[in-house]
């Protein structure tokens, strides 16, 4: 039973790290990244559809995203969805492709985004700590019920703490990498 608690805790901590990676991928760092378009839904034949299912997305230059629709009739819908989104970039449509030129970030905006990165990282750390607390509570309950001995409890608690420390270290590394990316000009 205790092994399952450890496995579940590890899985949940990994999910928190992956979630942070996804969230940080959405933060624009002054260079083109296809994940900027992940949350944009296009109204296509009455159904909301992700941009990446309607078009191929290429990065011909460091600060340019090029969107080539599979169906030329959807180009206006894609352009409209991008304009309505919160990414803050105006699309350029030449009839065949849509280009998004990512503007250079100002120093002030970089610092603002770095704060957002830290906030997201802290949220992930809180999630990891909550997983640790839940796992510890479950282990203590198992010990109380007589499923594991006190020595086993201490051993499993150390394992949970090691998982937590590793996960927090990974979150710090992910955060540092994104901050570095944001602050380089």
From Swiss-Prot:
One of its GO terms (biological process) is translational termination. It is found in: Cytoplasm. Keywords: Cytoplasm, Protein biosynthesis. The keyword Phosphoprotein does not apply. GO terms for molecular function: ribosomal large subunit binding. Its main location: cytoplasm. One of its GO terms (cellular component) is cytoplasm. It holds the Pfam family RRF. InterPro entries: Ribosome_recyc_fac, Ribosome_recyc_fac_dom, RRF_sf. Coiled coil: none annotated. The keyword Transcription does not apply. It comes from the Bacteria. Responsible for the release of ribosomes from messenger RNA at the termination of protein biosynthesis. May increase the efficiency of translation by recycling ribosomes from one round of translation to another. Belongs to the RRF family. This is Ribosome-recycling factor.
């Amino acid at each position: 039973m205790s092994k399952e608690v450890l496995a579940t805790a590890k899985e949940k901590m990994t999910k928190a790290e992956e979630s942070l990676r996804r969230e940080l991928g959405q933060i624009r760092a002054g260079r083109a990244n296809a994940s900027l378009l992940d949350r944009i839904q296009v109204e296509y034949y009455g159904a909301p559809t992700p941009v990446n299912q309607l078009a191929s997305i290429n990065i011909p230059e460091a600060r340019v995203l090029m969107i080539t629709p599979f169906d030329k009739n959807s180009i206006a819908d894609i352009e409209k969805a991008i304009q309505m989104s919160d990414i803050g970039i105006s699309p350029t449509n030449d009839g065949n492709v849509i280009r998004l030129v990512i503007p250079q970030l100002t120093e002030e905006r970089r610092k603002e985004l770095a704060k957002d990165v830290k906030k997201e990282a802290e949220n992930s750390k809180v999630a990891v700590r909550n997983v640790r607390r839940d796992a510890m509570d479950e282990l203590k309950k198992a010990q109380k019920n007589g499923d594991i001995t006190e020595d086993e409890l201490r051993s499993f608690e150390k394992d949970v703490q090691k998982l937590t420390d590793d996960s927090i270290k990974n979150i710090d590394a992910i955060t540092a990498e994104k901050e570095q990316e944001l602050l380089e000009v």
